[in-house]
Swiss-Prot record:
This is Putative outer membrane protein YedS. Belongs to the Gram-negative porin family. One of its GO terms (molecular function) is porin activity. SUPFAM superfamilies: Porins. It comes from Escherichia coli (strain K12). It is found in: Cell outer membrane. Pfam families: Porin_1. Keywords: Cell outer membrane, Ion transport, Membrane, Porin, Signal, Transmembrane, Transmembrane beta strand, Transport. GO terms for biological process: monoatomic ion transmembrane transport.
Length: 161
C-alpha cells in the first residue's frame, strides 16, 4: 500500500508548480517583496500549435511605502520567462504586470500601467484552476478583461456595502 501511495505522490510533486515569496525589506513603512513561480508543463494534443513543452517561470516584485497615515504608494512588476523555446525566440518572454498606484485608506486605490482591467475582478472568481481556469472571456491584452497596457484602474473593496 505504501508503494502505491508513493508511486502516485512522486509524479504529482514533479508536475505541481512551485510558488514562493520572500520579504526583502520591511522597515519604517517601506516594504519590498520578491516572489516567483516555476511550472513544468507538457501538453499532449493533436494540435501542433499547443502540443509539447509549455514550461515557464515567473519572477516579480511588489513594493509599498507609507506616505501618510491613510495614504500609501505601491507598485508591482512581474515577468514571465518561457522555458520552452530557444534563446533566439523572444516571443515567450514578456512583462505580465508593471504598474504603480496610490492607496487612499478605506477610499480605495488608483493605479496605472500594465495591469488587470476591472472586468477581470468579476471574472477572477472563476479563475481558480491551475490550468484552463477563467477561460470564459479573459485574455491577455484584451481591454479591461485581462492584462492590458495603459490601464488606469480604481478599486474599492467596500464600495457596495
Amino acid at each position: 500500500m505504501k508503494r502505491k501511495v508513493l508511486a502516485m505522490l512522486v509524479p504529482a510533486l514533479l508536475v505541481a508548480g512551485a510558488a514562493n515569496a520572500a520579504e526583502v525589506y520591511n522597515k519604517d513603512g517601506n516594504k519590498l517583496d520578491l516572489y516567483g513561480k516555476v511550472v513544468g508543463l507538457h501538453y499532449f494534443s493533436d494540435d501542433s500549435g499547443s502540443d509539447g513543452d509549455m514550461s515557464y517561470a515567473r519572477i516579480g516584485f511588489k513594493g509599498e511605502t507609507q506616505i501618510a497615515d491613510q495614504f500609501t504608494g505601491y507598485g508591482q512588476w512581474e515577468f514571465n520567462i518561457g522555458a520552452n523555446g530557444p534563446e533566439s525566440d523572444k516571443g515567450n518572454t514578456a512583462t505580465r504586470l508593471a504598474f504603480a498606484g496610490l492607496g487612499f485608506g478605506q477610499n480605495g486605490t488608483f493605479d496605472y500601467g500594465r495591469n488587470y482591467g476591472v472586468v477581470y475582478d468579476v471574472e477572477a472568481w472563476t479563475d481558480m484552476l491551475p490550468e484552463f481556469g477563467g477561460d470564459t472571456y479573459a485574455g491577455a491584452d484584451n481591454f479591461m478583461n485581462g492584462r492590458a497596457n495603459g490601464v488606469a484602474t480604481y478599486r474599492n473593496n467596500g464600495f457596495f456595502g
